[in-house]
């Protein structure tokens, strides 16, 4: 029909994917089979129990929350789903045959996702140290982008364009033991909610302060 369904997603304001999906569904020139949603869900659940896969990616939700939707679209993620960035294809723009017989190609560079990650060891840090350490880690991760050696030009350009980083955690069970918190208790749920809200807040705050110092990333 002249378009690919994977290039669209639904939001509260726009149902572009649903609209085009229904168009395809009603097109007699497109052949397919009808699968009950419940049967599909049963297969997914059985596979998840037996193998741990597949990993479910809710593209509508991810793209609706994408802070860089003005610059592209998120098509997929890695298995753990902590990397959610715009993806774009590199296309051939021009091919020049030189007099010496060599060929020069020019391309329009797409977005090639890069992964710059770090973790807080929750079992070895106090709540009072959290904000200071996160600020340091955010700065370190940003510096990694600058000094890292990318294997291909597209990944270098994408790193510089978005300056995307990921700050995660390790030692979560250690943290709970240190604070005498029983697993899946009401206290556990409350503490987890507060802890990770603080981590998110301190991370965004540190990123904001860094932007004041160094400027916003080019695709902002």
Task: Give short role names for the model-derived ranges.
Residues 33, 37-40, 49, 110-115, ...:
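Active-site-proximal structural scaffolding
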Residues 1-51:
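Polar, glycine-rich mid-to-C-terminal structural blocks
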Residues 43, 116, 171-175, 191, ...:
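A general alpha-helix detector
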Residues 48-159, 169-179:
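Function-dense linear segments that define catalytic or interfacial modules
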Residues 9, 17, 21, 55-58, ...:
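Aromatic side chains
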